[in-house]
Amino acid sequence: FRQFSLFKNGGFNLESFEQAIRDEAKSGSVRVILNFPQNPSGYSPTKDEAEKICQILKDVASSGVKILAISDDAYFGLNYEDNIEPESLFARTCDLHPNILAVKIDGPTKEDFVWGFRSGFLTFGNSTLTSEQYTALITKLMGIIRSSVSCSSTPPQSLLLRAIKDPATNIQKNEYRNILEERYKIVRNFCNTHKCSCLEPLPFNSGYFMSFNVIGKDSEQLRKKLLNEYGIGVVSIDSKTLRVAFSSIEKEKLETVYEAIFKAAEEL
């Protein structure tokens, strides 16, 4: 399992990504997970970054390396800036190169605002695969599902199918999306206008969350302080990363919550 440095100069670290891909390619194959909007940072690549990510994958595949490109799209579509790539990287990687097998993992939990449904789907894409090869992949996948989760919950799937057919669904989704975007903009403005010596916001432009790089303090200690003294719940990803779900905070309370986070960090 290989990680790479995600950010550089406020954007996606293409150099670190390419180095990690090329290092792993020495074995003859690469498995890469493309998780956008990225959790926990809440970052999605710009149009230019998405183009370059795909070019890196294509260049490596052209050298004879087999690539499994997995697009984790659980938060896809919740973009709040105009320069974000609007299309899933799955669509780009499907016919990018014969040596690339694209996989899309997606679900309605966040995109369709159905928290707790815990259902999703997985599909494949490659321009050179035959119907027989697709059938073989699907059969393998069905076997994995039967031997692990057995079967997905039927009620959520039935409800979602009915919702998809209802013309009111998209109207409601747009209303909720606008609420999230409004909350995002408040947080974006706060982070642009307020500074804390021990909290550095990681780049964010989409999704449900944003995170801070905790400088010189322990994020778990900060999490406990916020919960015990301020009644604010956040998640410490590791000792240096604190995730905040701005999506669940009413807009009138956002500035108060973030002021408390900054204050608690300084007090540690």
Question: Locations of the language-model features?
Answer:
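Active-site phosphate-binding strand-loop segment of PLP-dependent enzymes
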Residues: 6-84
